[in-house]
């Protein structure tokens, strides 16, 4: 799923007079990709928190409450600053420190806490992208993924409903 950054909170969560699932539920068992993360409204970003934690979302309306599954992988991308050149190896950033901070603050700490992996990707020069050396084939990568899933399946064979690490819970002490 790849919703536009102008999406409404209702379209993201689901709703309506007769509740329908939103993008969060439609991404169940898949990927929800948010490009230009800070461009989404604060409300839209904040409604992601609970489903990321609980893997379900409840849509409450006057007539009823509906619970939808919401076990998805959130993949998001963003620039390091409004102009996009902060930390760029060859281009100068034109943003003030205050502008950079304001831009980064559009994403709350609690939401960032739910994003398990954060990577800074530096731009590649065209020459490196155009390099004609063959990369790893999709078939080879596919086999590696299948093997990893088989290992996980064997690892959790005795635990019903668990097929990946994100479904594991620690017992309360």
Language-model features, listed with the residues they occupy:
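Conserved short S/T/G-enriched processing/targeting/catalytic segments and their helical context
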Residues: 32, 64, 70-168
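Conserved small/polar residues in nucleotide/adenosyl-binding loops
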Residues: 169-173
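Conserved ASCE/P-loop NTPase catalytic core
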Residues: 1-105
């Amino acid at each position: 799923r790849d919703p536009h950054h102008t999406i409404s909170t209702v379209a993201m969560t689901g709703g309506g007079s007769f509740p329908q699932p939103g993008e969060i539920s439609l991404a169940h068992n898949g990927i929800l990709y948010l490009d230009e993360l800070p461009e989404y409204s604060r409300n839209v970003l904040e409604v992601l928190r609970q489903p990321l934690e609980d893997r379900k979302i409840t849509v409450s309306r006057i007539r009823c409450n509906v619970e939808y599954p919401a076990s998805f992988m959130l993949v998001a991308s963003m620039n390091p600053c409004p102009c996009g050149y902060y930390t760029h190896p060859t281009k100068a950033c034109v943003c003030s420190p205050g502008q950079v901070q304001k831009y980064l603050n559009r994403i709350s700490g609690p939401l960032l806490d739910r994003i398990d992996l954060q990577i800074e990707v530096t731009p590649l020069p065209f020459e490196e992208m155009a390099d004609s050396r063959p990369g790893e084939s999709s078939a080879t990568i596919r086999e590696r993924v299948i093997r990893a899933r088989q290992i996980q399946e064997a690892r959790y064979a005795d635990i019903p409903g668990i097929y990946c690490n994100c479904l594991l819970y620690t017992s309360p002490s």
